[in-house]
Structures are given as structure tokens and as C-alpha cells.
Amino acid sequence: KGNKMSKSTGNVLDASDLLDKYPVDLVRFYFMWKSSPIETLNFSTKELMSRPYQILSTLFHIHLYFKQNSEYDKFNINEKTVDWAKDNDMLSSADIWLLSKLQKTIELCTKLNNECKFHESASAIEDFLINSLSQIYIPITKQELWNDDETKKNRRHVIYAIIAESLKTLDVLIHPFSPFTSEYLYTTIFGDKKSILLESWPKSTPALVNESIEESFDIMNEIVSVCAAARMKGK
């Protein structure tokens, strides 16, 4: 519910104190994620350290996951791209599903930013990062990445290409909200340019959108969620 900030009630937050205690990018992202142009904002440091922190932490750890595994596998990020995988007909259903989700996220974030609906844009980034990339794609491809069979190397490189494309796009999409974090992650992992500010804004590729595979995956994920909930209830 919240109360109005007032000096007399002693609930005013000093910006310098807030930024001494919490990362500036986390505070920035929280405000953009939380703020609606038509609603008052109930500020909570507890909420700040919950979902917004999880979003930035997940983004960081997937970059780390990609870096550790791709370097071990000697993956060349400039040679093995999504186009390479697509042209050689090496995309699995999971790859196609994630790429399709990514194109829609690009379109949605671009539209919402142009309409100054930044809180909805931040939520769209959250949805793709957490619900699609982190909770579905990474888990279902993990065993393939950890298969050291040399004959499966191309498959592993396809997965790296998909993750790299997703992360690079997310870095640019989230940059207006969390510039220091995205700059660090981009230059550490990709470094195509001296700064992420020199990157172009992502554009969706309609040819990568696949409605039928998206629908099939969404149904499958719903079934898995229901089964998991039933299993937890039965314990």
C-alpha cells in the first residue's frame, strides 16, 4: 500500500545513501521496471533486492556460463553465427523456438520504448531472459553442451551461437536501463566494438519467427509446469 514520503514522518530516502548501499544499475533498472506513467510508485528496498536483482544477476551468470563453456570448446563467436547454423540446417526445435521468442522481444521492446512505456519494456526483457532463456533453453541444452563427443561439436557450437545472439541482443536492449552492467558484459564477452554505444539497436528478423513451434513449446511448457506443481503438492 505504501505511504507518502515525508520529512516529518522520517521515511524520506536520500539518493546518495541509497546509491551507497545498492548498485546504481540495480536502482535504475528497478525504477524503470517499477514506474508506470499513470500510477504512483511504492518504493521498497526489499522489492529492489528481489525480482530486479534476480534479473540482473541472471543476466550476469548466463554471460559467465557462456564464457566458461564456449572458451573451453574453442568457440569462434565471429565465425559460428545464427546465420551459419541456419544456412547449414542445424537449428533444433528448441533453437528455433528461442530465436522466434527473441525476434518478438526485439519488436515489443522497440515499440514500447518508442511509446515511452519503459516499465513494460523492462518486463518484456525480464520475460525473455528469465522465462525463456534461463528457465527453459539453458536447462534443456545443458546436457548437449556437456557432451564432449567430438562428433557433437557442431551441435555445441550451434547452442553457443544461439546463446551469444540472445545475450548480445539483451545487452543492447537493457543498456538504457542498466548502462554500466551491460557495457561491462558486452565488452567482456563480445567486444566487437570499443563500447556498446557503438552498436546499432537490434532489428527483428521475420524469417526467424515460427508460430507453430512457439505454440508447441508453450503447450509443452505449460504441461511441465502443471506436472511440477502437482508433484510438489503431492510431497
What are these regions (language model features)?
Residues 15, 27, 52, 56, ...:
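Short runs of predominantly hydrophobic/aromatic residues within well-ordered alpha helices
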Residues 44-49, 126-127, 151-160:
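Conserved short loop/turn motifs at secondary-structure junctions
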Residues 1-3, 7-8, 30-32, 44, ...:
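Generic beta-strand/beta-sheet core signal
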Residues 32, 53-67, 92-105, 122-145, ...:
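Core structural elements
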Residues 3-88, 190-191, 233-235:
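Catalytic adenosine-cofactor/nucleotide-binding cores of aminoacyl-tRNA synthetases and other
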Residues 73-107, 139-234:
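Acidic, turn-prone loop/beta-hairpin segments
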Residues 12, 42-49, 104-125, 170, ...:
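Extended, non-catalytic structural segments that build the interaction scaffolds
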